[in-house]
Design a protein with these regions (language model features):
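N-terminal ligand-binding/catalytic initiation module
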Residues: 2-281, 536, 552, 558, ...
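Rossmann-fold NAD(P) dinucleotide-binding segment
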Residues: 380-389, 398-420
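Glycine-rich phosphate/diphosphate-binding loop of Rossmann-like nucleotide-binding domains
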Residues: 279-280, 284-395, 544
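Short acidic, glycine/serine/threonine-rich loops at helix termini
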Residues: 154-155, 176-187, 218-225, 269-275, ...
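Adenosine-phosphate binding glycine-rich loop
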Residues: 42-43, 285-289, 302-305, 418, ...
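Flexible, glycine/charged-enriched surface loops at secondary-structure junctions
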Residues: 206, 256-262, 308-312, 337-346, ...
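N-terminal Rossmann-like NAD(P) cofactor-binding subdomain of oxidoreductases
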Residues: 357-359, 376-378, 396-400, 407, ...
């Protein structure tokens, strides 16, 4: 059988799975019999050959039939068909991953448009809310603030030494659901599954991590099945000291590792990115990944409306870390088109729970002030739209139904093709649905959402609303990081990713309302995005590997394939 691909390991460290061209197979890791069947990385279930069964002590431990990978997949799909809810399907797939990693990824990658909504948005929201109640088996690492002073020792308990990416959260702001504490661990687990399923990043180098600093969610503290530390969150200073120790420990224990910050509270997300981005290889997906996929949607929309990014006037509903990340990346793209940073920021306004950001407000964080422009104070979004005259409206408020009919109609009066992105998730938090956007704009809106919605019919046309989901970006960036091992991660990499993604949207797809490529071909899409990002890494002299002659071929050489390998 074909062999699963892997990457060369530096400095003599050993991966948990055999190398791409290795022949020692299971013997190289000393697994036989039941131990082999209980290893999800090496388990082949019913696909072991007769020679493998004889050599590895498996005779009598598995059914007599030797099945192909396709037949195994058929059984999985049949069993999934008997599940009645997406949460049940999620639980089934998690159990599959715990038993047979190869078959899990073969399943997800066989039909990404079907399975991404199950293993991630929107099902992941319910899975996180019920995390302690559906918990089966430990995955990733749980690092408690009570271990402060001993973080390096804890990290050394992880069995894989060549970790390339740690995805880490403190559970402080999970999706649009707020503080979920340890329940938020579902997010790093799911994010890293998408690294592999969407961009082919080898899973053995990926580590989900939860930094447990407590929770202020009293309902969780009262839940007897809650899995986290039962105490309120610490002071900001105590938290940041803990994160400092964590970041330093990662650099020592996993020297080739990039830190992916995920779902921290808004002010912490902005502060921690600023604190570390020029010191270590790290990024924040909520800030940079969200900014990149939104910029990609804007670039695609401009293929319809004409014009450049620098000419757009943008209003955000929401002014937290996501809005700041989006605004910062869009402003950087405007600077690349010739504007000064100050002029680019002047094109972007924000509106939050207390109204329009303007200099007279005394409740603003420093990172919000570049987007507080001289305007009369206002708590009326429609009035702000009429005054500012934006070409694009972006919702990152986490509050559903806030793009009301008057809001959409105001945008439609100002623009022949208003660009309206309702990015909050999960589904019930979306600022408006595609049906509302198309109906209230009379079919004129160029719409995208943060979660997947079904097709919409309006005025005799069928619209396919695009999903501006970060999974178009962060797995590809993760693959580029995995392959090039950059010393730093820069905004230029995310801008390049946005252009590479938008370039793959066809005129026919734009005509149907799609602003992003179809999910059905997401691996090919993200390989091309990763190659573009890799070129930026090499052009910036940030890579720690030699530049290849062909970046796309280089990326493809690292892509994991969910195929069993020969073990004897």
């Amino acid at each position: 059988m074909a062999k699963a691909t892997s990457v060369p390991v530096k400095r003599g460290t050993a991966p948990t799975r055999p190398e791409k061209n290795g022949t020692a197979g299971a013997a190289a890791v000393g697994k036989r019999g039941i131990d082999l069947l209980h290893d999800p990385v090496l388990n082949k279930a019913t696909a072991y050959t007769e020679a493998e069964r004889q050599a590895l002590g498996l005779v009598g431990l598995v059914p007599d039939a030797t099945e192909s990978e396709d037949l195994q997949l058929r059984r999985v799909l049949q069993q999934l068909g008997h599940k009645t809810t997406d949460l049940d399907r999620y639980i089934y797939l998690v159990n599959l991953l715990d038993n047979d990693e190869t078959l899990f990824y073969r399943t997800i990658m066989s039909d990404p448009a079907r399975f991404l909504p199950i293993v991630y948005d929107p099902t992941i929201a319910e899975a996180c809310l019920k995390f302690g109640h559906i918990y089966r088996r430990a995955r990733g690492m749980y690092l408690s603030i009570t271990r402060k002073g001993h973080v390096k020792e804890v990290l050394r308990n992880w069995p894989v030494k060549d970790v390339r990416t740690v995805c880490v959260t403190d559970g402080g702001r999970i999706l649009g659901l707020g503080d979920l504490g340890a329940n938020g661990m579902g997010i790093p687990i799911g994010k890293l599954q998408l690294y592999t399923a969407c961009a082919g990043v080898p899973p053995q180098g990926l580590l989900p991590m939860y930094l447990d600093a407590g929770t202020n969610n009293q309902a969780l503290l009262n839940d007897p099945l809650y899995l986290g530390l039962r105490r309120p969150r610490p002071s900001t200073g105590e938290l940041y000291a803990f994160v400092d120790e964590f970041v330093e420990a990662v650099q020592e224990v996993f020297p080739d590792c990039c830190i992916h910050f995920e779902d921290w509270t808004g002010s912490d997300a902005v502060h921690l990115l600023a604190r570390y981005r020029d010191k270590v290889c790290c990024y924040n997906d909520d800030i940079q990944g969200t900014g990149s996929v939104t910029l990609a949607g804007l670039i695609a929309a401009l293929k319809v409306t004409g014009g450049k990014s620098r000419d757009q006037r943008i209003v955000f509903l929401g002014a937290g870390s996501a809005a700041i990340g989006l605004a910062g990346l869009i402003a950087s793209a405007m600077v690349q088109e010739g504007l000064s940073l100050k002029d680019a920021q002047a094109q972007i306004s924000m509106f939050d729970v207390n109204g329009l950001l303007e200099p007279g407000r005394t409740d603003l964080f420093d990172f919000q002030k570049p987007y507080a422009h001289p305007h009369a104070p206002s708590r009326d979004l429609v009035a702000c739209i009429q005054s500012i005259k934006p070409t694009m409206l972006i919702g990152v408020s986490t509050v559903g139904k806030t793009f009301t009919r008057p809001v959409v109609e105001a945008m439609s009066r100002l623009n022949d093709r208003p660009i309206i992105f309702a990015l909050s998730n999960p589904t019930e938090h979306a600022e408006c649905t595609p049906e509302e956007a198309y109906t209230w704009s009379r079919g004129k809106a160029l719409y995208a959402s943060g979660v997947q919605f079904p097709p919409v019919s309006y005025g005799g046309r069928a619209f396919l609303p695009g999903q501006a989901n970060n999974f178009y970006i962060f797995p590809a960036v993760g693959m580029a990081i995995h392959a090039t091992q950059p010393r730093r991660v820069t905004d230029e990499m995310f801008i390049a990713a946005a252009h590479a993604l938008a370039d793959q949207v066809t005129p026919a797809e734009l005509e149907q309302g799609l602003l992003f490529p179809p999910q059905s071909n997401i691996l090919e899409t993200e390989i091309k995005v990763a190659a573009r990002v890799a070129r930026v890494v090499f052009d910036s002299n940030l890579a720690r590997v030699e530049r290849p002659a062909d970046c796309e071929a280089f990326i493809r050489s690292h892509v994991y394939k969910p195929e069993y390998r020969d073990l004897v």
